[in-house]
Amino acid sequence: MSQKIRIKLKSYDHNLVDKSAEKIVKTVKTTGAVVTGPIPLPTNKKIFTVLRSPHVNKKSREQFELSSYKRLLDIYSSSSKTIDALMKLELPSGVEVEIKV
């Protein structure tokens, strides 16, 4: 086959993303394919500002932050063995995986 596979991982917890990327790298290396990465992509931060009081005190506000972490993996010289190993791989439920062939 020998095609390039690009895997993007996204999660709100950076530990989950790192562990998932490490798991994928170990699995792919056992099949004999070449892996580049994990490459950390920029962190997206969303900040929400909310009034603390429902009625008065406009000056009193509270801010909440939601950060999403991303990693990028490229797999070269993959075989059918590599693809089968990736399909059978169990990843945590908080990680979004996007695969492009």
Curated annotation (Swiss-Prot):
What is the superkingdom listed in this entry's lineage? Bacteria
One Pfam family this chain carries?
Ribosomal_S10
Q: Name one GO biological process term.
A: translation
**GO function terms (MF aspect):** structural constituent of ribosome; tRNA binding
Q: Which UniProt keywords apply?
A: Ribonucleoprotein, Ribosomal protein
Q: Does the keyword Repeat feature in the UniProt annotation?
A: no
Please give an example of a GO cellular component term from this record: ribonucleoprotein complex
Q: Which InterPro entries match?
A: Ribosomal_uS10, Ribosomal_uS10_CS, Ribosomal_uS10_dom, Ribosomal_uS10_dom_sf
Query: Of which family is this protein a member?
Result: Belongs to the universal ribosomal protein uS10 family.
| Its biological purpose | Involved in the binding of tRNA to the ribosomes.
- Subunit structure of this chain's protein: Part of the 30S ribosomal subunit.
Query: What is this protein called in UniProt?
Result: Small ribosomal subunit protein uS10
| Species per Swiss-Prot/TrEMBL record | Christiangramia forsetii (strain DSM 17595 / CGMCC 1.15422 / KT0803)
What gene is behind this protein? Answer: rpsJ
